[in-house]
Each structure stands twice: as C-alpha cells, then as structure tokens.
Amino acid sequence: MKSSLSLCQRAANAASKYERYVPSCGVFPLGFKVGSIATGVKKNGQLDLGVILSTYEREGGATAAAVFTTNKFKAAPVVASKERLAKSEGRGISAIVVNSGCANAVTGAVGLENANKVVQLVEQQLGRKDTTLLMSTGVIGQHLSMDKIEHGLGTLLNNDDAFGNDFSSWLSLSKAMMTTDTFPKLISSRFTLPGGTTYTLTGISKGAGMICPNMATLLGFIGTDLPISPSALQNILSSAVDRSFNCISVDGDMSTNDTIYMLASGAIDTDLITESSESFPLIKAQVTELAQNLAQLVVRDGEGSTKFVTVHVKRALNFADAKVIAKTISNSSLVKCALYGQDANWGRILCAIGYAQLGDCASLDESTLNVSFVGVGDSKGAELNLVVDGVPNVNINESKAATMLADTDLKIVVDLGTGTEECNFWTCDLSHEYISINADYRS
C-alpha cells in the first residue's frame, strides 16, 4: 500500500518534529557511559545496537528497577531480563543492551537462546555474570541476525572510544532504539534536593506505533547518579510509569516488548535513598515528571499523527476510574478519527465514557457530567462546552470548534463531578498516514 504522503512531505514532517523536540545539549548522570553501532540489521547504515554501562562500583554497582509488558506473549528479551533482575534482586547491574530492527518476540526456544547469548556475550566481556539486561524492538516473529549482533557487540565493546557520557553519545543511543520513530527522544535534568545534594536524571525512550502500554512498541530508560535502594527505586519507577507511560495511547495496541528500566549508579556521595528518606517523595515526583515528558514525546511522534491531545478526567471518585475513562476516550478509533477530521463530534466522546469499564459505577453520574474542549496551542485559553450538567450543548459554535480543532494541541476535559481524583492521559489522532505506515511496515 502506498503512502498518502509523499516522501518529501514525510521528511518535512519529521524534520519539523526533530527541530521542535530534540535538544541540542544536556547534562548526564555520573557513573554511566553509553555507546552505539550500526550492525546492518537496519537498512542504510542506521544505528541499531546500543549498550549502557554502569561504571561506578559503589557497594557492588548500580541498583535497578523495571516495569515490563503485561502482554501474554512476552518477548524473549523480556523473559531473559526478568530472570536476571530477579536473580540480582536489583543490585549490581552492569549493562543494558538494546537492539532495534528485530523484536525477537514470538520466536520460541531459539529466540530465548539468542537473547541469553546476547547478554552472555556482554557479561563475558565485563567478567560479571547475571548483571546484563536486554531490550529489543522491531518486527515480531523474526529471529535476531546473530552474526550481525555478535560482530557488532564485539566491535563496540572492544572500542573504548565508542563510549561516552556526553550529549552526542546519549543522542546516538536514543537513535539506535528507533524504528518508525521520526525523532530520538532524550530528556535530561539536574535537580538540587533541600539538603543541597545536586543530582541528574536522564531519560530516553522510543515508540511511535503499537502504543497503549500497560507496562507499546515502547522502550525506555531512566538513569540517575543518586544512590537508591532497589525497593525504593522500584517504588519510584512503578509509580512514575503508572502516571506516564501507562497513560498514553497512539493506536490501542500493547506490544510484546514493552520495557522501562531505571538504574541508579550511586556515583553521588550522599546517603542511600530509601522509602523513609525525607527526600524520597520529592525524587519520586521529579522522576514522574521526567517520565511524563518522555511519554508525551512518544505520543507527539505517533505514527501519522497531526494532533497531540490531552484527555483530562477530573472529580472522579478514585484515580482508577478517572484513568479508565481517560484511557477509553484515548483509545476510541471514532474519537481519534473525529479529531483528525476536525469534527466536534462530542457524541463519540460520551459513547466512550459510557462503555468505560469502571470499578465503581458511582463515579459516573449523568446529571453532574461536564465535557469541554480547551485550547492549548494557538487557541490557548479558549473553551468550548460540549455537555453541561449532563445536558448537551446543541448550539455549538462550529466556527470556534473548527478553529480549536485545527490546532496541533488540544485538551478534552471531562468533569465527572462525583469526587476529587483526576488523571491525565495523552493520545493523538488517527490519520490516513497511520494506515499507510503500518500497511508498508515490513516492506
């Protein structure tokens, strides 16, 4: 199937997003170095293999946490990494390997053998067993090109000059994770805690299609130089993912490979962070904010998308109900098509709200329901009420609606009026180009 956009149009769209969302510099956490290489798995000499190394050996090395896909057909790298993480109890992790172009998913015993061989190659080089984790992304149902992977890994690991902890190295790593992405996703920030300790967070992610995680194809990594206990790190990451990567949808499909890792190198000389540390809630909030920014970049890069949409559900009885309503709206193909067509079809939004699988139906009371469009981009500050106290606005200002829906950014606000909890979910529209990209995916 041929694309509805010309190659020139696709390139122009990609260039625009690259200029808008890719940084030109950054700060990066101590205790890491990263490298990447083109093995030939991807076409045209594109980077397709990367390695993150923990270089600080405080109390045995980096602590680790992870959140994996809940898809029943878990990919071989997910299975292999879960086993290693369990053995290590989140301590002493030395490396993370990421490859793109082949997901190594639904590949049976051979796929698992190949995944284990990849990590063993790294562990042999480093001289440390059961300390390497793996991420893979690409076409499902195909085996890894082990000759290319093995040669690429050997070349990379034997070249110290290929590794660094600078902007160029991290940007190249994020490029090595890309498949249908139009731009690499890299964020870094530096924070100072109340006691005066300054630390750094860096996050990278990939994803543009098959995005509706419940921890799509979505991969991510967050690194920090703080010393954090494994249990505290898992608490931080799980909470952050639940409010970020688990609150995005491009197409409603959950991948076999979803993986988010977080490593804490401990290179900053400060007390170990645990759940009882005074700074723990603040660090947790800062990691969540970074994860949300990373997750939003995935949606902004949604395959064929023209709009970035925030679905804000507020005044629900509980967070779970707010989230399921926001997710149901975000996953609705009819809502997404209406957004692409710039059609203020609020009936589709109400329909989605009505079939949301709520844990407590008391969260939804038709008489207190309010739904509106809120301008975010050029229409910032504008609001269009679609439903007020359960009564539809039959005299919608179509001209105002058209102006708001023409923006690239939009917010849909659903006020349930039954409680105090809220949730933000991020989605995009569904275009002809999405179909073209995925119809041509393996060609």
UniProtKB/Swiss-Prot annotation:
Keywords annotated in UniProt: Acyltransferase, Amino-acid biosynthesis, Arginine biosynthesis, Autocatalytic cleavage, Mitochondrion, Multifunctional enzyme, Transferase
Q: Can you cite a GO biological process for this protein?
A: L-arginine biosynthetic process
Spell out the catalytic residues.
Answer: 217
Q: Where does substrate bind?
A: 179, 206, 217, 303, 438, 443
An example of a Gene Ontology cellular component annotation for this protein is:
mitochondrial matrix
Q: Which reaction does it catalyse?
A: N(2)-acetyl-L-ornithine + L-glutamate = N-acetyl-L-glutamate + L-ornithine; L-glutamate + acetyl-CoA = N-acetyl-L-glutamate + CoA + H(+)
- InterPro entries reported for this sequence: Arg_biosynth_ArgJ, ArgJ-like_dom_sf, ArgJ_beta_C
Q: What main location does UniProt list?
A: mitochondrion
Biological pathway: Amino-acid biosynthesis; L-arginine biosynthesis; L-ornithine and N-acetyl-L-glutamate from L-glutamate and N(2)-acetyl-L-ornithine (cyclic): step 1/1; Amino-acid biosynthesis; L-arginine biosynthesis; N(2)-acetyl-L-ornithine from L-glutamate: step 1/4
Entry PTM:
The alpha and beta chains are autoproteolytically processed from a single precursor protein within the mitochondrion.
EC numbers on record: 2.3.1.35, 2.3.1.1
Residues the UniProt record annotates as site (Involved in the stabilization of negative charge on the oxyanion by the formation of the oxyanion hole): 137-138
User: Does Secreted appear among the keywords?
Assistant: no
- Locations listed in the record: Mitochondrion matrix
Mind listing the GO molecular function terms for this protein?
Answer: glutamate N-acetyltransferase activity; L-glutamate N-acetyltransferase activity
Q: What residues correspond to the site Cleavage?
A: 216-217
The record's function comment reads:
Catalyzes two activities which are involved in the cyclic version of arginine biosynthesis: the synthesis of acetylglutamate from glutamate and acetyl-CoA, and of ornithine by transacetylation between acetylornithine and glutamate.
Give the family, as the similarity comment puts it: Belongs to the ArgJ family.
Relay the record's extra comment: This protein may be expected to contain an N-terminal transit peptide but none has been predicted.
Query: What interactions and quaternary structure are annotated?
Result: Heterodimer of an alpha and a beta chain.
Question: What's the protein here called?
Answer: Arginine biosynthesis bifunctional protein ArgJ, mitochondrial
Q: Supply the source organism for this entry.
A: Eremothecium gossypii (strain ATCC 10895 / CBS 109.51 / FGSC 9923 / NRRL Y-1056)
